[in-house]
Amino acid sequence: MKFDILTLFPAMFEGPLTESILKRASEKGLIEVALHNIRDWAFDKHATADDAPYGGGAGMVMKVEPIAGAIEAVKAKRPNSKVVLTTPCGRPFNHQVAEELSREEGVVIICGRYEGVDERVRTLCVDDEISLGDFVLTGGEIAAMVIVDAVSRLVPGVLGSDESAQYDSFADGLLEYPQYTRPPEFRGEKVPDILLSGNHAEIAKWRRKEQMKRTLASRPELLDGIEWSKADKKLFAEVEKADQEKVAR
């Protein structure tokens, strides 16, 4: 999986890309992240990459020529890469979007800054626009880091076990079940007996119910449209009944 990141501040990526899972994935050749300074494609001696907005207004706007030049240079090497702009105007980033991107040959991420990019970047150069949520960041670099991290986890071999991604929150539409490790008791809080039983069928059933309980309590909107299996329908009915009884008390 190849990521090309177009940014005015490439040094911001040094920490996230040189530690932990992303570092190991890069060393193994499972992912490749190339940083491109947009100013390298500016035309003037000052490497100007932004200018005042037409029509007036506060702040500066990122110029179209340097961004277009950077994209063209990258696409000359990787013509099938998908070009993504990080922007509050984009579609919300979630697990499903990460899965979509993980199936691409490569992804080019444009990190927006200041008051945003010239509209012609969006109309002429971009395949997709992605937002982390209903808030505004100082720039798109942090959003790009999140996208690279989330997508890389889905690349085969990046995680120690492919099952790790399979059971992540949102992978099947539900939040992840509670996790425990040693010690078996801490400050009066014990690990559920079922997890110590060695009965893998019952453990799987408990974990599935806990996913349902946690999702119902914290993110009930995620339950809309889920196609339950017959066994899941029975489990969810038990979860709903217990929840209703709890509310009625």
Swiss-Prot record:
Pfam families: tRNA_m1G_MT. It is found in: Cytoplasm. Keywords: Cytoplasm, Methyltransferase, S-adenosyl-L-methionine, Transferase, tRNA processing. InterPro entries: Alpha/beta_knot_MTases, tRNA_m1G_MeTrfase_C_sf, tRNA_m1G_MeTrfase_TrmD, tRNA_m1G_MTases_N, tRNA_MeTrfase_TRMD/TRM10. Homodimer. PANTHER family: TRNA (GUANINE-N(1)-)-METHYLTRANSFERASE. NCBIfam families: PRK00026.1 (NF000648), trmD (TIGR00088). This is tRNA (guanine-N(1)-)-methyltransferase.
